[in-house]
């Protein structure tokens, strides 16, 4: 684990950093780099709605190509599926020997969708939290733990540069863990697919369906399997599974111990291993690329099918009753 004393902020302060993208992570990186005394410009395509916001927040903005030409450290924080085209069209033609190309996620490098020149340092600085939290912690004098990795190191100074960058966005205040592009990418994708997004979503929908099919009101099913999930996850987030079990009733704890393994059994683990293999061998990324090349048609169809599930209809109606719940733009427009 690396902390403030292990990183030299002057290294990144002596470089020119171009941040490509101004989404959740892009705005947090750009503003915190600036506040740490780093020269920074933001790269956004002409016509981007975020350009006005960048200027309002006191940052310089230009096209990705112009920023790549100006910078000697380029942090690519555009969406995964857009990065290869941005690299090919805007970044690669403007790279020079000694430049560094940074990422917030390792997918495009690990699976060979982006292949930088050998003379360019390739590294990753990945905060383990959303951008708004990264920025808020930085402003409060704290930080969010980060992962760093170096894939190409022609100068032998890649790790020091990555640590310096991590320090500039507050990461070394909390702690920085050294990893590899392979491990970060594969664990991140597996967590998303098997547990956080895919697994949890299907578990919630299955529970809802079982209750409704058994004759219970959809509203009650929604509260029991979706709404109250936040209470449980918050307890786990704060103190792990043990904290959650300590905090719930004895009835809930006992029932969970008995019934949980009936839902998630050895067969579930076998299917999880299949998901992991599909990630490791590149099958998932091939499907992801095919979807993008096909105009996102498969993704749009899957979105449509999931949006039509009864739990979404019931949930929207119930959330109208909850003044304390922040409403997404799609429900307030």
UniProtKB/Swiss-Prot annotation:
PROSITE patterns: KARI_C, KARI_N. It holds the Pfam family KARI_C. It catalyses: (2R)-2,3-dihydroxy-3-methylbutanoate + NADP(+) = (2S)-2-acetolactate + NADPH + H(+); (2R,3R)-2,3-dihydroxy-3-methylpentanoate + NADP(+) = (S)-2-ethyl-2-hydroxy-3-oxobutanoate + NADPH + H(+). Binds 2 magnesium ions per subunit. Residues 180-325 form the KARI C-terminal knotted domain. The keyword Metal-binding applies. InterPro entries: 6-PGluconate_DH-like_C_sf, KARI, KARI_C, KARI_N, KARI_prok, NAD(P)-bd_dom_sf. Belongs to the ketol-acid reductoisomerase family. HAMAP family: IlvC. Involved in the biosynthesis of branched-chain amino acids (BCAA). Catalyzes an alkyl-migration followed by a ketol-acid reduction of (S)-2-acetolactate (S2AL) to yield (R)-2,3-dihydroxy-isovalerate. In the isomerase reaction, S2AL is rearranged via a Mg-dependent methyl migration to produce 3-hydroxy-3-methyl-2-ketobutyrate (HMKB). In the reductase reaction, this 2-ketoacid undergoes a metal-dependent reduction by NADPH to yield (R)-2,3-dihydroxy-isovalerate. This is Ketol-acid reductoisomerase (NADP(+)).
């Amino acid at each position: 684990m690396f902390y403030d004393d292990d990183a030299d902020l002057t290294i990144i302060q002596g470089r020119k950093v171009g941040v490509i993208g101004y989404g959740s992570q892009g705005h947090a990186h750009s503003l915190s780099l600036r506040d740490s005394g780093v020269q920074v410009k933001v790269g956004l395509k002409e016509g981007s709605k975020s350009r006005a916001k960048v200027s309002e927040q006191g940052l310089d903005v230009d096209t990705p190509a112009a920023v790549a030409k100006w910078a000697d450290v380029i942090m690519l924080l555009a969406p995964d599926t857009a990065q290869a085209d941005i690299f090919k069209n805007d970044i690669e033609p403007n790279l020079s020997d000694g430049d560094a190309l940074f990422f917030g996620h390792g997918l495009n490098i690990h699976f060979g969708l982006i292949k930088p020149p050998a003379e360019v340092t390739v590294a990753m600085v990945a905060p383990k939290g959303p951008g708004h939290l990264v920025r808020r912690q930085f402003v409060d004098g704290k930080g969010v733990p980060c992962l760093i990795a170096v894939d190409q190191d022609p100068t032998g100074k890649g790790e020091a540069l990555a640590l310096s960058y991590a320090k500039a966005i507050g990461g070394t205040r909390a702690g920085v863990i050294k990893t590899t592009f392979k491990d970060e990418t594969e664990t991140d994708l597996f967590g998303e697919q098997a547990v956080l997004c895919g697994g949890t979503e299907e578990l919630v929908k299955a529970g809802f369906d079982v209750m409704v099919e058994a004759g219970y009101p959809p509203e009650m099913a929604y509260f029991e399997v979706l709404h109250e999930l936040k209470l449980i996850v918050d307890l786990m987030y704060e103190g792990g599974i043990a904290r959650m079990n300590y905090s719930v009733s004895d009835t809930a704890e006992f029932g969970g111990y008995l019934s949980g393994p009936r839902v998630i059994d050895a067969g579930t683990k076998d299917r999880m291993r299949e998901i992991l293999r599909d990630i490791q061998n590149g099958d998932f990324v091939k499907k992801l690329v095919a979807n993008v090349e096909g105009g996102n048609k498969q993704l749009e169809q899957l979105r449509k099918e999931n949006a039509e599930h009864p739990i979404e209809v019931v949930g929207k109606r119930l959330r109208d009753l909850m003044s304390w719940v922040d409403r997404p733009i799609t429900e307030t427009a």
